[in-house]
């Protein structure tokens, strides 16, 4: 089961098959911090979210969980409180291995639920 509608899931799978998916750190940021970028998720989970963005590291770590203390601190001490204060997003989440479609690049989903889930 996908969090995307059938149409968007088909577009995602086609882009994946064709090798057309952008590396997360190559997606143009809509906001930047020292270690992190906020980017729009082109293949959003549109069954649940009206807005679906991601926080991605500017660098690509060697393994999924290899974040530095500085990157973690910026995320939890600066970015999350700032986004929470704005009141625009409803959730932040990361996926464990069984649910990751991008398994080689640590990223956090930030999203706003569609009205029926609020």
Predicted ranges, named:
Residues 1-118:
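HIT superfamily nucleotide-processing domains
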